[in-house]
Amino acid sequence: MVKIRLLSNAENCFSAFESSGHASGSHAGGGHADFGDNDGKPEKGGNIVCAAVTILLKTAVLSLSSAQKESSSLKAEIRADNPGYLSAKITAFSGDDKPRLQYLLEFLTIGLMAIEAEYPDCLDLQIE
């Protein structure tokens, strides 16, 4: 199961996310057993839930990286310590960064809630 904590601040701006784990089960691969090796692990990209979550979170990370280049006030700490783990945390921002951070929160909330609604056994989303 993929576990994600999505955090916002008092101004309804994106604050952080932490994602860990891998989706598993028959629904996670669209009903197909896509096993790429004898260890029973799915092939990279063979799990629709992992792929969808990865695309959303990596897009968020790319957006933050791009925003940091455009804004001297926006600072983010991004970690990908091991396979199946990704986190991003805003460490500094200004009022000019708020619209982008509010949109990023909305983007992640809508996308991740849609995945969780369709695959509740594969994604555990906590929004705080």
Regions found by a protein language model. Name each.
Residues M1-I48, L62-E128:
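N-terminal intrinsically disordered, cationic/polar leader segments
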Residues T59:
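A short, conserved beta-to-alpha structural element at the edge of catalytic cores
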